[in-house]
Amino acid sequence: MAKKSMIAKQKRTQKYKVREYTRCERCGRPHSVMRKFKLCRICFRELAYKGQIPGVKKASW
């Protein structure tokens, strides 16, 4: 889990647009966040396996 202080810091409007970054909506993780779903890879995988993300299914080839 991300620190509450870091999540609060990120939510504030930044002075420069470049300083803004994405965070996972579910756990607050700052790395490997998918913009389309606003989830990190770990949360995305958990929810996809449970079938809670519409239109996402496990690939097999």
From Swiss-Prot:
GO cellular component, one term: small ribosomal subunit
Binding sites annotated in the UniProt record for Zn(2+): 24, 27, 40, 43
Transmembrane residue ranges: none
Coiled-coil region list: none
Cofactor: Zn(2+)
GO biological process: one example: translation
UniProt xrefs under Gene3D superfamilies: 30s Ribosomal Protein S14, Chain N (4.10.830.10)
Keyword Metal-binding: yes
Single GO term (MF): zinc ion binding
Top-rank taxon, per record: Bacteria
Subunit architecture: Part of the 30S ribosomal subunit. Contacts proteins S3 and S10.
Matches recorded under NCBIfam families: PRK08061.1
Protein's name according to its UniProt entry: Small ribosomal subunit protein uS14
